[in-house]
Amino acid sequence: MVAGCATLRRAGTNFWELERGPSGQAPDPATTPEPVVQVYAARTVGLRGLFAVHTWIAVKPRDAISYTRYEVIGWGVDRGAPAVRVNRAGPDNYWFGDRPERLVDLRGDGVDTIIARVESAVASYPYPSAYRIWPGPNSNTFTAWVGRSVPELKLKLPLTAIGKDYWCRRGATAAGGLYQPPAE
């Protein structure tokens, strides 16, 4: 309920006035030599935020001095901009007034290998120039694609990640949701 109230409060504010700075959840690369992979979700802007989140992935290889943030953004796609955006914002920035929830936080040995697989999944995303709020493809379709392509992430997107099942074949699962086939 608190998230819903915060979303409604943000709904009446001009989007350019909303907080978009760092949330302090990503370790400082200047003092963190180890590799890092993080996945975030934040409520969307306006009334849609009652029902939906925007997700993204941030990676920092060993000894890197900065993060790389991967996400899908719809703004401008209809005018020829790519849907997949790189480094549009910091790794853990607020999403138009909403503090993101960290869904994945991997660090240390073996994470550089995972980062290489994440980058390969980003490059092979099947909808790099497409965006549609519902049913997808959207930011959650992208993040789900990477998660399915890199099972070591152990990514579990929330129910509010609308679009995560955009391409899936319908079928029952033990949890009663949609069948989510692994990436090939």
Regions found by a protein language model. Give the residues of each.
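Active-site nucleophilic cysteine motif
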Residues: Y131-K164
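Non-catalytic ligand/cofactor/substrate-binding and regulatory segments of enzyme domains
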Residues: G4-P137, R148-S149, R169, A174-E184
